[in-house]
Amino acid sequence: MVHLKALASGTLFASLASSAVISRQAAASINDAFVAHGKKYFGTCSDQALLQNSQNEAIVRADFGQLTPENSMKWDALEPSQGSFSFAGADFLADYAKTNNKLVRGHTLVWHSQLPSWVQGITDKDTLTEVIKNHITTIMQRYKGQIYAWDVVNEIFDEDGTLRDSVFSQVLGEDFVRIAFETAREADPNAKLYINDYNLDSADYAKTKGMVSYVKKWLDAGVPIDGIVSLLPPRDEGLTSCTALTALASTGVSEVAVTELDIEGASSESYLEVVNACLDVSSCVGITVWGVSDKDSWRSSTSPLLFDSNYQAKDAYNAIIDAL
């Protein structure tokens, strides 16, 4: 079991607390340090506008080893009308990642939100099946060999662990999951295929138990699910990240990962707990924080990220670097 240096000691903790912002250690890369501990990446989300912001881009290039498109690969961005695809934003991110030697996590293929009305209005099983297959195949074949992993289905569970009510579950039942994963495997056999959801930060949650139960069943039925991604919560309160990741790994998937990580207040202790959890679970391949700077966060008022609104490294960033 690997553990980072604890922050419980009074001297170190007082030192961190004494400064609101500690200047970034120029020689350090949080990705390189994490990979040195046997992981694949420490990543962030981005898109064209953020990558064209010189301050943001410099940090992405120097510190992070993986990129997840924040919005440019969602259904409404890629296929706003049936059969009409718009790849400009997604191409920009994929090209940037290739040029700068970054892994890419494709996000996301099937999701109930940011879904065009033309998809939401489908009521026929055969029609929806073909729409899902065409959407996944077109996108994945375009980026075949460029995407390390895809979030194939996203946020499909309710808090009680049952399937969320969506056009996909209404029309196809749970079979939409099989359809999506089998289509994705055929489109790019080498990409890792993930199921992604939030509020999986405790093994005791009904949602976590539901995820574990369904994934075990789908794997037993031959559905090609490679991994589970946990969207850890945007708050600062007694996380139980390690036991939760262990529970997800127990399903039999080959990989688990943490994504969309932003913690309200960005305390060093909470960020270190998540990092330690991933280090302690051998199948956890990486962590993705949901943005670079608080300025650009969708939750900017809660200051949840590793860099402040002036693009300066915060205590949590430096604590991770120091500990790794």
Curated annotation (Swiss-Prot):
Its main location: secreted. Residues 1-19 form the signal peptide. Its EC number is 3.2.1.8. It catalyses: Endohydrolysis of (1->4)-beta-D-xylosidic linkages in xylans. It is an enzyme of class 3 (hydrolase). Endo-1,4-beta-xylanase involved in the hydrolysis of xylan, a major structural heterogeneous polysaccharide found in plant biomass representing the second most abundant polysaccharide in the biosphere, after cellulose. Belongs to the glycosyl hydrolase 10 (cellulase F) family. This is Probable endo-1,4-beta-xylanase F3.
